[in-house]
A protein has these predicted regions:
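N-terminal beta1-alpha1 ligand-phosphate binding loop
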Residues: 1-26
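A structural signal for isolated positions on well-ordered beta-strands in alpha/beta enzyme cores
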Residues: 2-4, 30, 101
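Residue-level preference for long, well-ordered alpha-helices that form the structural scaffold
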Residues: 10, 75-78, 82, 142-145, ...
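Short, well-ordered alpha-helices that flank and scaffold nucleotide-derived cofactor binding pockets
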Residues: 19-23, 27, 91, 120, ...
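Short gly/ser/thr-rich secondary-structure transition/capping motifs
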Residues: 27-35
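Helix-loop-strand module that forms the ligand-binding subsite of alpha/beta enzymes
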Residues: 34-128
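Glycine-rich phosphate/pyrophosphate-binding loop and the adjoining helix
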Residues: 128-168
């Protein structure tokens, strides 16, 4: 199954989860940032999985993402702001007809959901949900990921691939 796992990541946590999901889906899955997820890459995919961090209790806006530059002094490393926000990427996504899923990285107690917003936008573009939105936890605002989350992400990818291939 050809799959693209698209991510917005600022401190590497969401990117790591995306790579684990792609590994779980199988050898024809690729993880790529919103900057690299071109319309050509998306058109070739049977499954699109998209994920972003929870910002401001939802999917971050472009101005919220740009505001992360002010976090550089507090964070262990500067945020990666080199790629478009997931919201911007989704706004540029053309109509599709394949399967899709969504995930988010977040602190456990935060209300709201980026993943539900992502999946809703994918559905509005014509994609059919392949799984319920998934949450992966970080230990603090900048990470790292909680123990076991990479393994859980890989398992989630494998479960989706199995379900979509019709295997019992």
């Amino acid at each position: 199954m050809k799959a693209v796992v698209v991510y917005e990541s600022h401190w590497g946590n969401t990117a790591a989860i995306a790579r684990a999901i792609a590994e779980g889906i199988g050898p024809e899955a690729r993880a790529m940032s919103t900057a690299d997820a071109t319309s050509e890459a998306i058109a070739e995919a049977d499954l699109i999985v998209a994920g972003a961090p929870l910002l401001g209790f939802s999917l971050g806006t472009e101005s919220m993402v740009k505001g992360l530059a002010g976090e550089a002094a507090k964070a262990p490393s500067p945020p990666d702001l080199s790629h478009p926000s997931m919201r911007s990427w989704l706004e540029g996504l053309g109509k599709g007809s394949g399967r899709a899923a969504a995930f988010e990285t977040r602190i456990w107690w935060s209300p709201g959901s980026a993943a539900k917003t992502i999946l809703g936008k994918l559905q509005a573009a014509g994609y059919t949900p392949a799984a319920k939105p998934e949450r992966f936890m970080v230990k603090g605002r900048y990470g790292p990921l909680k123990d076991g989350e990479l393994e859980r992400a890989k398992a989630w990818g494998a479960e989706m691939a199995k379900a979509l291939s019709g295997q019992p």
